[in-house]
């Protein structure tokens, strides 16, 4: 069994990876790996236990899915730093503005995903 994405799907996934590359490499909360068997795998990391997290592990099927996961992780990181809680769905207006400000450079490079940012505040799938 060898995973093959449609060329357009693979291109959109790799575009998201390229834009978020520094964040992907430096985050301690998840890992993004390639498997010849299933494709890109997103693995959440439990930093307390030092192991794979119980939830959040999946095969990446499209660029939008990966974008949503990365933006969610980034928003949680921002909330950990400046928020009153770590959950972006509970962000105050000021916290939302800070999240939007910090995610803006990524969105500038991925204009097709502009409409997806608000999902972080509603946890819409």
Spans of model-derived segments:
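Acidic, low-complexity, intrinsically disordered interaction modules
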Residues: 29-105
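Context-gated lysine
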Residues: 2-3, 10, 37, 69, ...
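Negatively charged, low-complexity tracts enriched in Asp/Glu with abundant Ser/Thr
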Residues: 1-31, 110, 117-123
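Acidic, proline/glycine-rich low-complexity IDRs
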Residues: 94-125
């Amino acid at each position: 069994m060898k995973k093959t994405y449609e060329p357009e799907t693979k291109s959109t996934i790799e575009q998201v990876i390229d834009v978020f590359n520094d964040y992907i490499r430096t985050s301690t909360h998840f890992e993004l790996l390639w498997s010849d068997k299933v494709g890109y795998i997103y693995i959440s990391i439990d930093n307390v236990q030092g192991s794979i997290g119980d939830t959040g592990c999946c095969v990446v099927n499209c660029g939008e899915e990966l974008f949503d996961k990365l933006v969610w992780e980034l928003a949680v990181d921002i909330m950990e730093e400046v928020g009153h809680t770590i959950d972006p769905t509970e962000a105050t207006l000021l916290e939302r503005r800070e999240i939007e400000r910090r995610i803006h450079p990524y969105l500038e490079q991925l204009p097709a995903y502009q409409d997806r940012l608000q999902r972080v505040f509603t946890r819409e799938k």
